[in-house]
Every structure is written in structure tokens, then in C-alpha cells.
Amino acid sequence: MTHPYLALEGVSYVLADGRALFSELTDTFDHRRTGLVGRNGVGKSVLARLLAGELSPSAGRCVRGGKVHYLSQQISSDGAATVAQLAGVQPVLRALARIESGGSDPSDFDLVGDDWDIRQRLQAELERQGLPALPPETGAATLSGGEAMRVALAGAWLAQADFLILDEPSNHLDRAGRQALVEQLLRWPKGLLVISHDRQLLAHMERIVELSPQGLRSYGGGYDFYADCRARERDNAAQTLEQRKLERRRE
């Protein structure tokens, strides 16, 4: 069995004002649960969109080994959007309704594919998200931020993707919602990249990758292991600096 993966091959990205956000990034994200960390503004969300194919790199290339589903940290929808649209299943539900009404358009059958039970699967996923009484036609504008995120997460699990990229998925979630998210991430059997500042969520990752102005650096283990490594690196850097100061005084 071939594992899903995402690969960066010498990827650079230049902003509209001509500034290079990052340059020559090369790394591979495999089937392990991976957390992407870094300070605000360093380019984590841009990197996520590059990996998902929503943006094109200024140089280099992104390789996607499988179907990717990307969940932005900004859950946006127009005023007429519904729960089904937010979950990404509205086109299939509409095609299914046309078929059930006697329609025979081949494009509708192509759209439905094997998803004849999509209504039941959506309802089951919404129940797992703690939203059991939420009809698909409910207006998205009536949802709180946490409810909208949970609907979007339901759509992510339903997407049948080989690789999930989740950007700050615990935003707006309460304690119960965060715990449910962790449990689903632990059950997810395929590729996973989570961009987050949530240390409790990152503690369940199998690998941490840090994006900094110097590029990407990979750390095995969860957030605690990463934090220990970074603390040792800072201590070593401080000791080296003190040693150099001492040597200069002796000159």
C-alpha cells in the first residue's frame, strides 16, 4: 500500500510587495500526524495553501501524493450558504435530490458517484460533532463560530481525502469540541498536517515541523519533545555566546 504524502521541492514564495516570505523549502510530509508551528506572520497558512494547491509557488514545486482536503482557519461563507455547503456536500445532495425526483442527467449520477448514503453520513458526522439537530438546509449565518468550525470539520472527515491539512482547527471550539477533535485526529488513518498554536492538540502529533525565517526544521515526537529540544538549543546558544564573550575579554 502506498502511503499519502506531500512534498516541497525547493519551494519559494514571494509576496505581492516583492518580499520573499520563504525560500528554497524542501521537506516531505508523510502519513504521520504532523504539527506545523512557528511565530505569527512567518507564513504557515501560506505554506498550507501551497501544499493544498490553492496557491502556486514562486519557485520550486509542491507534489501531492493523493487527494488533499484543506480546511482554512477562516470559515467564510456567503449570506445564503447552508450547513451542507459549509460541509462541502451541497452539490452531491442537490444531485441526489434531482435523481430522487425522477431526473436522469448522467452528470448527476457522476456527481453522486458512490455517495448514495451522503445524507445519513452527514447526519452521523454532525452527531459526532455534537450537532445532532442540525438539518443540512440550515443557514450557515445562524451558526456560532464554534458550530461553523464543527460543521467544517464534519466536512473534512466526509471528504474521503488521502491527506488532511487543518489550519487552526481548534479555533472557536469549547473544551468538549477540542476533545472530540483530538479523538478524531487519533482515529484518522491517513496523512495529516495540523497548523496550530494549541499545545494540547500538538501534544498528540507524532512529528513537529517548525517554520522560521531560516526555513523548515523537523522534530520527532509531539510538542513536549519539540519544546525540550528548543529549550536545549536556546541554552546551548546562550552558553556559546557567554563563552565567546569570555574569550574576547581574554584577548
Task: List the predicted regions and their residue ranges.
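A short, flexible loop at the N-terminus of ABC-type nucleotide-binding domains that lies
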Residues: M1-L8, S12-L25
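Helix-to-loop junction immediately C-terminal to a conserved catalytic motif
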Residues: A52
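ABC nucleotide-binding domain "signature motif"
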Residues: S58-G66, L216-R217
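ABC-family P-loop ATPase nucleotide-binding domains
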Residues: I75-T142, K245
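Conserved beta-strand-loop-alpha-helix hinge in the C-terminal portion
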Residues: A80-A81, Q85, L211-Q243, R249
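Hydrophobic anchor residue at the start of the ABC signature
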Residues: L153, L181
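Catalytic Walker B motif of ABC-type/P-loop ATPase nucleotide-binding domains
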Residues: L164-E168, L173
